[in-house]
């Protein structure tokens, strides 16, 4: 063994060729943490000092190559002063440059996923051989930053500016054949031939058949584009990418600016440009929020995985209530490998459910994401039925009937008598208490909530609700089934609205107050979309359904009368009475028309102003900032209450629930991180300015205590 560390080893293979192998002990994947970088420094120095070494193969001892930097280290690193952070980045880059400058040929053997710093390591090698099953990419823009280990320098010089911009700005993973096509790798081979192919390649370079120094040279020089070509490549790309990313996600455009700024420099000077831009992005609130989201997501996955130890395997599922929701649940279950019975009380419901599943499958086939054979297999996994005849071997039943407690209790009690004693029953309710529904059951310990969000195939979140009598086995099995369906489950405790809807309705409450104060709902929508929401509150209510919003508002008012009950009628009342139910019947706040592609689009409908007139109680002058505060303060404070009440266990889960469940702007990180970004004391002072609007705007005693003590939710 030439070098042996905890993350890297260097061993002799044959004929002066050595293998530099990444295999981080105690971890399931390789990543560039401080330890790995330090050992890479030592390994490169060892190779450089050994005159007997003729060539180097870089490999991984794990199923993946390297997943990138250790994101957990970013939080502390990014708090360092700018100059210190730049110096640290350049010091790390010197390791990659020294590896690139070795006086022997180097080949990276990419066996699995190589992302971020993992790909940047490969770019520093002279040649790259890739397993056909592997994927490579630079996903840093998804964290609000860009590649910081030479990716913006080496990739454009290797595959051309246009291709590099596309790879870096999109941040997606790229398949082997696409990597070969653009020249990011030199060969693609079967996984079991990878090491042999890398050996053969390095031998040909050692023999002089391939000139590795000539291959290396373009990466050390300036970009081969003249001034006009540069202007065309960069200015066009900046305009397009800015339009795609939007103003709240600066990283993709900053990456292009960095490539442009460094285009006329050689490698070392270009790396300095990269480091300066990287540090600038690292200090943005968008980067801090997106990195926080990534870490929250990891925490969520870890918590969900912990339930695997006691969960039962769901081999056969069932859904009660077909229709669009039932069809969506059936599609999601069957497409991820769990066969499902889909029961309804009439043929029409069954037809609707099957049509929904078929529509989603055809869409995947049309886009080339699924074969016709796979579609047939998934459809065969959905068995429609009007009876309970086959429910005897079902492991878990999702109840998805109408949102009415009496109807749900009748259906749940009925199905309980048709299934095994240990079958889990899960109600897809959005607001009704699980403990209340459980009163109709003989085995309440087998009952939980399983709240899917609409549309099921697109929304990543599932709330798993623990009732007063729900067993840990029932909770764990439901979490495992949600994961198997490809969803991100969050376990919450029972209360009206659970986490997401409990927090959403105060947001709608702020909106109702604004409309009743004479503020134009179109203006409110525009401001909240600019703030970062995927759609404004009026449009969102139309999409959800005014009737659904009306019912949910009443449930929440009953559950939390001290702050959510309003004796005055509001916009949702008059729209509901006027039978303007939103998208579902073509009129709500907006009117809806079908475009040429058959999709609904919203259009202005002046007649709605007459409908709203009776609930406009005053004409109040408000600024854009006021509108944001009227909307966001109630949402944030209710999230705080959910955490304090133990509805959700951690701040990370609360924030991820809002991002995944209602599209909270990711670059703001979630409600609690948003409070942190303002400052807890500053947020409390801000809320106090709006105290006259009612109890929804009153901070809790505990939040005031946090403000007094200088505390935050994420430290």
Swiss-Prot record:
Keywords from the named record: Fatty acid metabolism, Isomerase, Lipid degradation, Lipid metabolism, Lyase, Multifunctional enzyme, NAD, Oxidoreductase
Enzyme Commission number(s): 4.2.1.17, 5.1.2.3, 5.3.3.8, 1.1.1.35
Residues the UniProt record annotates as site (Important for catalytic activity): 120, 140
Record PROSITE patterns: 3HCDH (PS00067), ENOYL_COA_HYDRATASE (PS00166)
Binding site for substrate: 297, 501, 660
InterPro entries (alphabetical): 3-OHacyl-CoA_DH_CS (IPR006180), 3-OHacyl-CoA_DH_NAD-bd (IPR006176), 3HC_DH_C (IPR006108), 6-PGluconate_DH-like_C_sf (IPR008927), ClpP/crotonase-like_dom_sf (IPR029045), Enoyl-CoA_hyd/isom_CS (IPR018376), Enoyl-CoA_hydra/iso (IPR001753), FA_oxidation_alpha_subunit (IPR050136)
Span list, region Enoyl-CoA hydratase/isomerase: 1-190
Record keyword Cell inner membrane present: no
KW Nucleotide-binding (keyword) present: no
Chemical reaction(s) catalysed: a (3S)-3-hydroxyacyl-CoA + NAD(+) = a 3-oxoacyl-CoA + NADH + H(+); a (3S)-3-hydroxyacyl-CoA = a (2E)-enoyl-CoA + H2O; a 4-saturated-(3S)-3-hydroxyacyl-CoA = a (3E)-enoyl-CoA + H2O; (3S)-3-hydroxybutanoyl-CoA = (3R)-3-hydroxybutanoyl-CoA
GO BP: fatty acid beta-oxidation
Pathway per the UniProt entry: Lipid metabolism; fatty acid beta-oxidation
A single GO molecular function term of this UniProt record: enoyl-CoA hydratase activity
Chain residue ranges for the region called 3-hydroxyacyl-CoA dehydrogenase: 312-715
Binding site for NAD(+): 325, 344, 401-403, 408, 430, 454
Cellular component per GO, a single term: fatty acid beta-oxidation multienzyme complex
Family: In the N-terminal section; belongs to the enoyl-CoA hydratase/isomerase family.
Subunit note: Heterotetramer of two alpha chains (FadB) and two beta chains (FadA).
Main function: Involved in the aerobic and anaerobic degradation of long-chain fatty acids via beta-oxidation cycle. Catalyzes the formation of 3-oxoacyl-CoA from enoyl-CoA via L-3-hydroxyacyl-CoA. It can also use D-3-hydroxyacyl-CoA and cis-3-enoyl-CoA as substrate.
Protein name: Fatty acid oxidation complex subunit alpha
Organism field: Pseudomonas fluorescens (strain ATCC BAA-477 / NRRL B-23932 / Pf-5)
Organism ancestry: Bacteria, Pseudomonadati, Pseudomonadota, Gammaproteobacteria, Pseudomonadales
